[in-house]
Amino acid sequence: MKTIRKVMFMGLLLLLALPMAAQRKVKFTIAEKTTEQPIIGAVITYADNEKLKSPQRVVTNMDGEATISVPQSGKCYYQVVSVGYNPLRGTIGNDSSLKLFMTEDVMKVNEVVVTGSRTARPIKLSPVSTQVIGGKELVDAGYADLTKALQQETPGMNIQKVGFGNEISMQGLDARHVLFLQDGERLTGDMAGNLDYERFNLHAIDRIEIVKGASSTLYGSRASGAVINLITKKTTKPIDIQAGVRWGQMNETNYKNPSKKDFLYMFEKNADRPNLQSWVSAGFNAGKVTSQTDVWYSSSDAFYMYQAENDKKVYTQEANPWLDHDVTITSVASRPPMSIEGTEHISVSQKVFYDPFKNLEILAYGSAFYMNTYDLIQDMTFSQARDWTAGTKIKYSFKDWFQITASLHGDFYDRFKRHERIDERTKVYKSRIFQPRLSITSQKFEGHDLILGIEHLSDDLTSDRFNGDASHIMRTRSLKETEAFLQDEWTMNDHWMVSAGVRTNFSRAFGLMAMPKIAFKWSPSEHWAWRANYSMGYRSPSIKELFFNWDHLGMFMIKGNEDLKPEKNNYVSLGTEYSNDNFFISGNVYGNFFRKKIEGVWRIYDMQYNFEYTNLSNQNLIGLEAIMRWHFLNHFTMNATYSYVNVSKTDGIQVNTTSPHAATASLDYKYNKKNYRLGATFSASYMGEKKFDVQDRLSVNGESHDAYFRCQLPQYVLCNLSVIQTFYNKVKVTVGVDNIFNYVPKTLGSGITMFNVPATAGAKAHVQVEVLVDELVKAFRKKK
């Protein structure tokens, strides 16, 4: 009996050992083709089937190496993926080692995106048209901040300077219809829909994903025009430390050699802050724990912009049918210069990722942002902003059935008026948002990507701008919304995809609203794709549009309207694209049809100017966009975009300030060797002529009439040039000139109206140095 047991036991051990004996090791080495530098953090997926079902994964180390175990016999298939590179696929033969070289994805068609569907997939396989802009490419191109980068890289986007700061518009829609997200989360602290865009650290961004059109199905009522999602970095290296500094020419020197004895010393000093930036990005990956820390400091000087001629108002017969002919009135006095504020700000962000075991991922994050804004008004005060964000996200996968994600996000923004000479400040604005979210995604059913979710948004605003007088009493207004959404992306076969979904929005103020969406993608071949999309958008009035009532420096009143109704829009688009290894082109035509669109309009009451919010009857926007990318002669890449939009008039009046035509173009040159890289970028952005009407009053024969004068702003082109050199893959030096042909706007406004113009003082040079600290330390250690 004992002998039988021994035989059975030995047989069991032999059976268990057979799989071990049938395995062999294969070592992968992944490097960049042109420089032969190791690619760290490349993901190698392998399986015993060509479709890579039920795969295993490994990640390359600091030397670009990873080892896998494969069967002694039979085929094994692999895929290598790394951000910014073309993926590699192949079959593992009898070799015990493989050295593979990856090439840069200059066409950007293999980027993995999440914004359009909230599920990760390569951009070329997404049913929703998505533009991806790499963060590294923006820094290398010499852009100083996010607004300059988006203006140049995004077709149809217009970022201009107005009285309260920057103003963004896209496809004829202003910032109230463009939802900015950071890692998928909302932000607060906006003015007329515009955030403090200085809070976005360009050096902390991994990529930017832009989805145009009504995206309300997944992102709610603020996404009726577009979604811009800033995805921040997450290091894949054991140690990753980068530090840099950027110096730029001053726009204008307002005060030479200010003395500390001067009564206005702090004002003079703040007005002429240096155009200086510095940053540190540090992270580590220790297996189960990954940390990412980013710190950014920036300052810029204040300057004046001057109008070449006196104010001119042209009252056209088209906008004022009661006139017998066009009337032109020219001011006898010169227009005062327009001041552009200087800023000084610092931002700090921290993310910690913890993966305790295979199916669980935990993220905790927080950030802080402080900004001083220095105007050129000698009133002994300046504006100060403070923002805190914090949140957590937990993701758990139940086998291959479904994945559940729970998150909490909060953003806390304050604005102050601070005294220049004494340590005293007064809070004038407090905004808080809190958003819990729960979602379930599943790929259990073959060909289907399902997502189901529910979220709640609590928005509280405290300000002294609800009173209608100069009492400065702080009051609080709130809006609460609860939303649920469902979406399915169905891959029918290799050629067809369908995405359909619906979102419901409920608030006590405006009741229940449902927003459907459906999108189709047809790929007749691997090079061609067609996309068609319909979606319903919805935007409820903001707290400011409902309740604001304040006097702007005695110049005019800004008045909300508690009778506002939510605006609705129907968005349709049809687009096509073609791509191969060296060429990409896409075109898209769209229509955006609004009902009860919320707009701010000027009203004149006995020469008292009011800016009031109202629902327009309807407004239609028809447009087209084209994007082209061409890589040629191994070293050159040409990029070009064009955007056209036609905005319907309201009773013959054009209140929209968007230019119908906009275009961008750039030519990039890259020369790469093992220990040296050279890159040069020449870029240009074109903005067409703008024509719009502004309400005013006009006296004719002693009788005062409501009237509209026409603003006509000329077309212009801004060009930039930057040259970047990388030495030993450790030190980057960039030299460039912004606005190289020295364009300066000549028309700034008329009357109390300030036009949206590019805030530039002319051609300015900059120098930037960035050091890969961890690579330098590693090199020094090797020498020892």
Describe every region a protein language model picked out.
Residues 244, 491-494, 591-593, 614-695, ...:
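Gram-negative outer-membrane beta-barrel transporters
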